[in-house]
Amino acid sequence: MKKLLLVSLLGAIAATTANAGSTTIQPYVGAGYTFLNNDDVDVHFLGLNGGLQFNEYVGAEVFWNKSVNDIEFDGDLDEFGVRTDADVQYYGIGLTAKYPLANNFYAKGMAGYARVDLDVDATFQGYTVSTSEDDSGLIVQAGAGYNFTPNLAAEVAYTHVSAFDGFNGINAQLKYNF
């Protein structure tokens, strides 16, 4: 529900600003890949984001990422016949910062709030036990981007999510500016 509300709010703001011809607010959408890990697990995500660039330096963004790999936990019990299946997603909102550099490059950063949802199924001899857990915390990104055209950019960033004792990794994405 929160995701739907955030995306709806972003769409309403973007539609309003699209009609205000003299505004400098620029909406964008993006899609990308994120790899996050901590001491217990490695997770690969595909995700979507959308945002508003308020001026050359400051913006706001909403994001959603869903795990796409077979997540294996340290100490998995496969050798005992227990099969685990996990699904992770994280979503949230953040403030973004950009600083133009030379030759279409720019430095970028984001700080915000992220919620992480974890669903795990464990199956043993035909019996399945399911559990869900969620946590929230800060998300911080620091990286760089390159503008191929005024509308198309690529970004790479170090990412830290503090939920569930912290995850660190890398994010790569393509963005389209309207």
Locate each region found by the language model.
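Residues that define the transmembrane beta-barrel architecture of outer-membrane proteins
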Residues: 25, 42-46, 87-91, 134-140, ...
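Residue-level signature of outer-membrane beta-barrel architecture
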Residues: 52, 97-99, 146, 160, ...
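Outer-membrane beta-barrel translocator domains and adjoining extracellular loop/strand segments
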Residues: 39-45, 70-81, 118-129, 164-172
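Short glycine/proline- and aromatic-enriched beta-strand/turn motifs that initiate or cap beta-hairpins
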Residues: 19-70, 91, 97, 115
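Cleavable N-terminal export/targeting peptides
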Residues: 1-26
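Outer-membrane beta-barrel "beta-signal"
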Residues: 146, 153, 167-178
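Repeated loop/turn-to-beta-strand initiation elements of outer-membrane beta-barrel proteins
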Residues: 27-29, 57-62, 103-107, 146-156
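Membrane-embedded beta-strands of outer-membrane beta-barrel proteins
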Residues: 48-50, 93-95, 142, 154, ...
